[in-house]
C-alpha cells in the first residue's frame, strides 16, 4: 500500500468511525483490534458499511456482518484495499464484488480551476440547513423524492459533529453539496455532488476550488477521496491522481 493510497484508505476509516458515533447510526464491533458494522438505516448499500483491516478478516467475522445486516434487512458494502487475500473469505460467505471505487488524491497546494463565479459557499450549521443539504445531496446523486428519513436524520447528526458539511449556493438556491473529514495530513471529500441542472456550468470546479481553499486553511497536505467510475473523469480533470482500486464486496448488485 503506497503512501497516497494509504492516506485515502485511512481517511475513509476515520470518516466511517465518525459516522459510527452518530446518534442516527447503529453499529456493532467486529474485532477487539478494531473494525465494525455500520448501519445508517438506509436502503442504499453505499450508506451501510463494514470496516475491518484485511488482516483481521475471517469467515466468522464475515458471517457476523451478514447476520447484522440480514437481521435489519439492509444492503451494505465491504471495501478492501485492492486485490488482497481477504477477498476469498468474503466470497466464501456469499459476498461478491459489486463495484470498485478509485482511490484518488490532490496536493492541497494545487491551483484551483476557474468556474461557477456566481456561486457562494455556506457551511451547514443549523438543523434547517442540514435538512436542505440532505435534500440536495439526495437529488444530486439521483434519488427520487421524498428524501428518506434516514438521509435527513443522518445529515442532521453529521452537522452537529466535527464533520464539515458545505453547500454551493446560486443566490439563495442550494445547488451542490460536499462533506469534509480531516485525518492527520489528509482532508477527505465525501458527498461531492451537483444538481443535474447545474452540471457542465462550472459548479463542480468552483466547489473543488472551495475544497482547496478549506484544505489550505486547515493546513492539510493532501485532499483524498474515493471516486465512483462516473466521477473519475471529473476528478482527473480537476488534477487528481489515481492510486488504485478499492473493490466493494456486497450482498447487493446495486452499490452506486
Q: PLM features: residue spans?
A:
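Acyl-donor-binding surface of acyltransferase catalytic domains
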Residues: 54-128, 227, 249-251
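N-terminal charged segments
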Residues: 1-72, 87
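Conserved active-site alpha-helix within GNAT-family acetyltransferase domains
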Residues: 84-97, 205, 217, 229-245
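A conserved beta-turn-beta hairpin within the catalytic core of GNAT-like acetyltransferases
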Residues: 43-49, 98, 181-190, 199
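A conserved beta-strand-loop-helix scaffold within acyl/acetyltransferase catalytic domains
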Residues: 145-195
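Conserved acetyl-CoA-binding loop-helix of GNAT-fold acetyltransferases
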Residues: 58-67, 191-194, 200-213, 217, ...
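A short helix-loop-beta-strand connector motif used in the catalytic cores of GNAT acetyltransferases and
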Residues: 21-29, 72-75, 81, 98-101, ...
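A short, well-structured alpha-helix characteristic of acyl/acetyltransferase catalytic modules
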Residues: 127-139
